[in-house]
Amino acid sequence: MPADQRPLAIALMGPTASGKTALALEAAERWNGEIVSVDSALVYRGLEIGAAKPDAAMRAAVPHHLLDLRDPWQVYSAAEFAGDARQAIAQIVARGKLPILAGGTGLYFRALLEGLSHLPEADRAARASIAAEAEQIGWAGLHSELARVDPVAAARIHATDPQRIQRALEVYRISGRPISYWQALPPGLRLPVRVLKVVLAPRERAVLHGRIERRLDAMLAQGFLAEVEQVRALPQMRAVAVPLDLPAVRAVGYRQAWEYLDGAGSLAEFRDKAIQATRQLAKRQLTWLRGELDARWFDPELDRHQLERALVGFLGDRSAVRQASGV
């Protein structure tokens, strides 16, 4: 199929708290779209307030996909996401609608848009062994080990990113080859749609930091800590030996809330830690996004007109058609 005949889709990317959800809803209403979440926290049931999951009104107004796929004690891989997202996109296109990929999880975007190398499957025993070692020497110590066996991967993975450290060491231990070897292999099947990549990011870092702080305060006012208490109280979560090793609990904000509810520090200290962790996440997201050379960057507040022109230029101006048809 020629490239210009492929179905269209848009990818709304950006750091946390940059306005992706609002733009996705606007685009879905204007261009008759459905939203495919590209967020590793939103796949977990029970993670609502702290994950900024679309509420019932949003989901009633616009169909959303890939939310609430797993319980918080379960694991969901990038490969599983890519398969589920590909299926959702095919169904959206079959309905004659626009797929809108919205989120900030770079690994998910990479898996879907570029394909994943043929990495070895997850190994529970290896993961458990690595988690036990982390209890003894810490993730920084394991990052040092990774630097010895796979310096290429260690240079890409931050010492405070336990999930990726664990996966890189797991791959090395079960296959005998570093994860960077597997990632350098030709990727799998690419997504058969033509995608416009849009990055939303305030030009001034202070603006993003302010949005992060205000959003956390709003989450606390909405009952974020009570939500985490509910997740902690689930029998399946109470049965987990080291819940802080679960991907759902490692989500930014949830980890800091979990530690606070375990008695680590005051409420003010929890707030400061959560804000700092979210800023660090945003920094990592921006670093990854700068590698997306075919993406177009817009300030969500200052570049509204340029952003609209870019979307209309790619998708066409369907607003008049939709208004006339009553859709």
Swiss-Prot record:
Residues 39-42, 163-167 are annotated as: Interaction with substrate tRNA. Keywords: ATP-binding, Magnesium, Nucleotide-binding, Transferase, tRNA processing. Pfam families: IPPT (PF01715). Transmembrane segments: none annotated. GO terms for biological process: tRNA modification. SUPFAM superfamilies: P-loop containing nucleoside triphosphate hydrolases. It comes from the Bacteria. ATP binds at residues 14-21. It is an enzyme of class 2 (transferase). GO terms for molecular function: ATP binding; tRNA dimethylallyltransferase activity. Its EC number is 2.5.1.75. Belongs to the IPP transferase family. This is tRNA dimethylallyltransferase. It comes from Xanthomonas oryzae pv. oryzae (strain MAFF 311018). The lineage of its organism: Bacteria, Pseudomonadati, Pseudomonadota, Gammaproteobacteria, Lysobacterales.
